[in-house]
Amino acid sequence: MKDMASQNHAALCGSLAVKEEDGNCYNRQFFVQPDGNVSTYDKHHLFKYGGEDRYYHTGNQRTVVSYQGFRFLLVTCYDLRFPVWSRYQEDYDAIICVANWPESRQDVWHILLRARAIENQCYVIGCNRVGDDPNCHYIGHSAIIDSRGRTLVEGQEEEALTLTAEIDKESLLAFRQKFRVLDDRDRFHLAPQ
């Protein structure tokens, strides 16, 4: 990932299963910048329905990465279903969600991407896999959503592809300033698990 980020002069994001020296495994997301700087996030909400909790440990720290003037909150797949994880702090401009959502739940994928964008007044970048597992078919439909819930770009094909859209921090901040929803949000802290 470091080589690809450097060669393409772009940050890359993806997730891998990682086994630590203590034997604990994590579903870890990596945010790799072109200069070789790497930030990580360990998935917080493990997908019990799929047995993920039998193999992985839960991450308990949110990760916000600064890159080219934007602050990106990293979330992984099932985390998207839990709005409190992203809602309780206003410390980011965009959410990046790397996911493994099957075709059978594509409608939910689209709704949740838009909901997280609207309720947090932020961009949401959702990157979903394609391909097949023994019990699931994945059709992608990666998307970039703006702070009003509008789809800027969306993949329609069942193959790996590159999507691009311009995200503009000035217009994001102007929208937040004009329509001050975040000022009225409930203030709370998450208790350690």
Where are these regions (language model features)?
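CN hydrolase (nitrilase-like) catalytic-core segments centered on the catalytic cysteine
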Residues: 1-13, 80-163
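Active-site catalytic loop in hydrolytic enzyme cores
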Residues: 20-90, 104-111, 177-181
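Alpha-helix boundary/capping detector
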Residues: 30-31, 122, 143, 191
